Amino acid sequence: MRGKIIGAALAGLWLAFSGPAGAAEPVATTDGEASGIRLAVQDLKVANGVATLRFTVLNEADTPLNYNTMRDPNNGEGGSVDGIYLIDAANKKKYLVVKDADKHCLCSRNLEHVASKSSANLWAKFPAPPDSVQKIGVVVPHFIPMDDVPISR
């Protein structure tokens, strides 16, 4: 009985990870370095010179996932996802999360953790790559990098 309940709960989490009924499928997915952690890029849209990355983290593990694993290890803001960056292989450029005048990231922040057996919808903003760039790499600390993530404009 317990196995059926856990299986049903994980199936529900996977639906949340995939988005609501009728929602578009993620444009890219990857696994975390730790077992039971996955990430799905919902979209990467460019408007007005800014790229917005929307993504979901799914924690199927038995322990919470601390957001500090996704922060910038050098100048990062605790409880944020400011360690994410984009890689433009064609132009050999790395795009970091945009920061405001107070050096706070324009990203999901003031976060604690993704609870066990749950998911979280997150976002981050970057300088827009040139119009000629149609796909880009997305690197999230402690997740396998994703190459060729499509950019919508």
Question: Which stretches of residues belong to each language-model region?
Answer:
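Positively charged n-region of N-terminal signal peptides that target proteins for export
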Residues: 1-5
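Bacterial N-terminal signal peptides
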Residues: 7-18
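N-terminal secretory signal peptides
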Residues: 24-76
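Surface-exposed edge beta-strand/loop patches
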Residues: 24-30, 111-153
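Envelope-exposed proteins and targeting segments
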Residues: 35-37, 49-53, 82, 120-122, ...
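A mature extracytoplasmic/lumenal domain signature
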Residues: 43-45, 56-59, 69-71, 90, ...
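The feature marks short-to-medium sequence segments in extracytoplasmic or secretory-pathway proteins
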Residues: 47, 58-111
